[in-house]
Amino acid sequence: MSTTAMWLLLAVVVIVIVFASVLYKRTFTVHELALTGVMAALSLVAYLFFRVPFYGGSSFHLGNTFTALTALLLDGVSGGLAGAIGLALADILAGDPGYAVTTFILKFIIGITCGAVAHKVFKLRELDKHTPGYLAKVIVAAASGLLLNVFTDPFLGYFRNVYIFGQEYTIAKALTKITGGVTFVNSVASTV
């Protein structure tokens, strides 16, 4: 797939997510936009400057930490957008534009999941921070999206490698196993 087609695909994904936000009548305050932008920048910096590249296109990094943190502080959509924008741009700037589309989708899923568990299931905004179990609920909310990524990242990565990059099935399957392990370590490190 050409670079132009990848940019087009990324643009379509962004437009679909923005359109979905409009359908759900989601509006952002200036504070939310500013914090989302700062967290997107922090996730980009955490990926570009503090990562350990690993075989198969994956790497150890703490960029997902800011996705989960934004989802906990604001909401799932803001967290998803912070991680999606920051880490998709990081992929492009790191010279891996082919990964940007799946990164955008995966990080948005992390943010939505963390935010839904934090604010819809546990209702963290309504709880007193000093109540017993508050910290455990925060950790579970953060871990929910990050651990979901352990399954979705290798799954989407397999299809990206086979159908976009044109890899053989056996190679893509082997890389999926490696990616799953690296993603698990990233998830645990980002949760802690």
Where are these regions (language model features)?
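Loop-helix junctions at membrane interfaces
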Residues: M1-V192
